[in-house]
Amino acid sequence: MPTTIDEGLPAPHNFVSFTTLIARKYQNLIEKTISFIPQRWAFVGFLSFLYILRVSLSSGGWYVITYALGIFLLTRFIAFLSPKWDPELEEDSGDSLPTTLNRNDDEAKPFIRRLPEFLFWHSIFKALFISIFCTFIPFLDLPVFWPILLLYFIIIFSVTMKKQIKHMIKYKYIPFTVGKKTYTKNNS
């Protein structure tokens, strides 16, 4: 009988079973963190601090890695702010059958995100972890003129956020909610 690792699982005999075991343990650990929202985001903040500290204290600039991380985080943030079903696309499709006779555009509709909060957090966590790892690989510190990357990122950020805010105003949705509104009984 092969030796066992914790939880009574058989010891891995080859690389595939070892990676499967690691993937299962990672998935189990990630799933245990679902209900700990403030702690998860605090850990992402800590990873961000570690990344900034690593980049600022190292001899290289890591400009390309930082730029790629910024662009990735921007795309994830836009997906987090976007509704799952784009009202602009639904408006254009005139071939579908109407579901109600009188359609009220002021009707309250729930906001469902294209990228849920947990997946948003998980993608940021993985991106920061990979970025920190990449700063330990010397050949990834490419020599670039960083002000151009910074200017380009600022332009991309401002254009995409302006477009997203206009979309939010046009279709009257607010992606930031704190939950269901509760009413209290007034004793006076």
UniProtKB/Swiss-Prot annotation:
Its membrane topology is listed as: Multi-pass membrane protein
Transmembrane helix in keyword set: yes
GO CC terms in record: endoplasmic reticulum; Golgi membrane
Primary localisation category: membrane
GO biological processes: protein retention in ER lumen; protein transport; retrograde vesicle-mediated transport, Golgi to endoplasmic reticulum
Transmembrane residue ranges: 33-53, 61-81, 115-135, 136-156
Q: Extract the InterPro entries matched here.
A: Rer1
Where can this protein be found?
Membrane
Alphabetically ordered keywords of this record: Membrane, Protein transport, Transmembrane, Transmembrane helix, Transport
* Annotated family: Belongs to the RER1 family.
Q: What does the function comment of this entry state?
A: May be involved in protein transport along the secretory pathway.
Q: What is the name of this protein?
A: Protein RER1 homolog
Q: Which gene encodes it?
A: rer1
